[in-house]
Amino acid sequence: MAQFQVYRAPGGRLVLDLQTDLIDTGSRVVASLVPASSGPKAIGRLEPVFTIEGAAYVLHTAEMAAVPSALLTQGAPVADLSGSDYEIRGALDIVFSGF
């Protein structure tokens, strides 16, 4: 598993793996990616928007959770957002530091 890979969780929702590749705890810290069309406007740097499979998705950074790694290994990653690490880390900074 690689940090900033997008996986399809059971039930079909997309999640972004936020955890470093350097530790293996049997679980992974993830945040949901929600279709931009299904909710309120994204909140600035806290909720960056990414295009995945041709559609806009909002990263719900403040709703992070740890899930068993096995939930993410049932299929290949849907997308690789490692090229957006600046935006993702910025969103995490907002959650943990407030700026």
Task: Please report, for each region that a protein language model flagged, where it lies by residue.
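Generic, low-specificity signal for short hydrophobic/alpha-helical stretches with a mild N-terminal bias
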Residues: 12, 32, 70-74
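Beta-strand-connecting loop/turn residues
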Residues: 12-13, 55
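Compact nucleic-acid interaction/catalytic patches
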Residues: 3-10, 16-49
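C-terminal terminal-subdomain/extension
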Residues: 53-99
